[in-house]
Amino acid sequence: MPRYVIINADDFGLSCSINRGIMEAHRFGTVSSASLMVNTPGFQEAVSLAKSTPSLGVGLHFNLTYGTPATNPLLVPSLVGAGGSFHGNQAEWTCRDIARELYTQYGRMLKHGLRPTHVDSHQHIHLDNPVVYSLVKKLVQYEELPLRLPSNRPDPELPWVTDELFMYTYDSQIGVPHLLSLLCKIPEGITELLCHPGYVDDDVRRLSTMTTAREEELFVFIDPQVVVCIAELQAHGILQVIHYGQFQAIRSVLTRGR
């Protein structure tokens, strides 16, 4: 069976410096997909970049923990603190407010001319919170979109899920040798390789605890050894880099071939 990998950069739109790093990695032929935050400082720029770069698949990075909601804060009171920003306390969230914010964020992408290629979430809240998961699941089922799920948490009701999920960002062995090793170990089927490349600016320092690690990842993904390795694996038909917008067609072919 063929081997496919989606190299997905999270936090597209977090800041202009993150956008710059993701686009640089994409131009180098490594990052093929990105997950867009719609309520962060770099959103408008990210939309323009996405529209001018159709080779980059762009999904929704559902966010309930950073910044202010896409919805009027008065309409989602359980999600925000006194200042109108997300407080991140899941114990206070209500199903109604989560659903309202989810569909507002999804709708904001559509209103800006982008149909998400997939859905995932910031800080994996759809995996950690059962209510969030049930709401996101309903959305992707209705819209027929892929959803990020690890292989140890399969959902038979969701057909558009990768066979494997490699969370490169959370691996203690970040570096060129380790990434080269991972690329050579991509299994048959479709795998997502999750990463967080980007440059760091004041917005990133204000909004995220992940700072220098982003630049470290970026330098790995644009390293000549990595770029050449991916190009050679593709040239020899060993591995194909795709994005989530190509997922369903490839999955259908793979399913028919079984």
Explain the meaning of each model-derived region:
Residues 1-6, 16-57, 65-118, 130-258:
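Terminal accessory/targeting
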Residues 61, 122-124, 196:
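Histidine-centered divalent metal-coordination motifs
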